[in-house]
Amino acid sequence: MMETMPNWLMQRAFLTPDRTAIEIEEEKVTFMELHEKVVSVCEHLTHVGVERGQKVAVLMKNGMEMITVIHALSYVGAVAVLLNTRLSREELLWQMDDAEVVCLVTDQDFDAKDVPVYSLAEVMNGPKEEASIQEEFSLEEAMTIIYTSGTTGKPKGVILTYGNHWASAVGSSLNLGLRDDDCWLACMPMFHVGGLSLLMKNIMYGMRILLVPKYDADFIHKALQTRGVTIISVVSKMLTDLLERLGAETYPSSLRCMLLGGGPAPKPLLEACVEKGIPVYQTYGMTETSSQICTLSADYMLTKVGSAGKPLFQCQLRIEKDGVVVPPLVEGEIVVKGPNVTGGYFNREDATRETIQNGWLHTGDLGYLDEEGFLYVLDRRSDLIISGGENIYPAQIEEVLLSHPAVAEAGVVGMSDDKWGQVPAAFVVKSGAVTEEEILHFCEEKLAKYKVPKKACFLEELPRNASKKLLRRELRQLVEEM
């Protein structure tokens, strides 16, 4: 028998109807008002044919409209396929095709070829139809699909169930605690699992969310000072921006947690936070773990510099090398397990079998545990470039470069950047006449802006080992010598 729970938002609206759910700029919406908005969206989506079990793509920016669509799809029992608004049209079409979506709901102009596109504004101005609302959720059913890229650069749809999202929120509350006055400032895109997880916490905890539609460091800085924010999720770039604006001031003591993800933070940044009394909690997680799976509390932010902490209460973590669990201080692959971990990838049985074995997720990330069990992440999928908190996979950029008629070989690595942490740099072996400008322009047409290499260098040949595998470490050395 499948385990079920009451529809989360319906239950929250029943329990605390008049409590503020969402604040966006000057607009405030209670949980009951949010529920009523969602029912209306649900009825309009039902009229255009959205049904239980279907997969529906969502291409929207942060805002009340996106929140209501995500909840409305769960009300009708459809699976929300959340698309990154920063991707190119080609990338989006590929993901929609791969996910077998029946339609796209969006707040922007988009031609999806063979898939019906519904502008939310037009849908809401049209007729509505009584909807069959799911009053219970089965924890085993898929709620969302979010695309991530493996080391091959091929996107994979991570299936996250209601149970995964529930376990993630419970684990976070056991880790960070809950207070009646908690308010989480949400500035992460909701198409990322980190942003989406805040919507889950919002209705499960009954916690106020202050939603920032678009990243604005000045607004966020002021909000932390004046809007009663107690928790915020950030990456290093955001934290640096906030410290610059803070100057000699400090944030209110009510700000009890800065949850820092997107890779290890530099020690000077953490030391500055200690000086300012800012409690930074470093985290490690991924789409496959429904957001964080490890967190380093502020108590250890300087004594365990570089550590991602220990697993959440209901999660397990170990380090393996060649299939064998290794002792502390020995490097190996980070392997995790828990109720927040995905059961697999959509239509990727081989990748699922390779990645998840006996319930343990093989992350592909390298790290080690110290003698006290604190995790240190050494390399995120070894080749991964993390730029402003966004994951960039070199193989995807290389695939685009190799599609250019004048490119014979291509290799991409991360290059240090003061603003973004890292940006892509490309190395190309030419097969015909082509300039650096032409290469970069070609990439701009095929890739999201943040994935476009900031530099393209030409080589006679790329460094490879005896089995002809690309030696990225040598490319990184070339970047450092530039």
Swiss-Prot record:
GO terms for biological process: menaquinone biosynthetic process. The keyword Secreted does not apply. Its EC number is 6.2.1.26. It comes from Bacillus cereus (strain ATCC 14579 / DSM 31 / CCUG 7414 / JCM 2152 / NBRC 15305 / NCIMB 9373 / NCTC 2599 / NRRL B-3711). Disulfide bonds: none annotated. PANTHER family: LONG-CHAIN-FATTY-ACID--COA LIGASE, NONRIBOSOMAL PEPTIDE SYNTHASE PES1 (EUROFUNG)-RELATED. One of its GO terms (molecular function) is ATP binding. It holds the Pfam family AMP-binding_C. Gene3D superfamilies: 3.30.300.30, N-terminal domain of ligase-like. Belongs to the ATP-dependent AMP-binding enzyme family. MenE subfamily. This is 2-succinylbenzoate--CoA ligase. Keywords: ATP-binding, Ligase, Menaquinone biosynthesis, Nucleotide-binding. It catalyses: 2-succinylbenzoate + ATP + CoA = 2-succinylbenzoyl-CoA + AMP + diphosphate. It is an enzyme of class 6 (ligase).
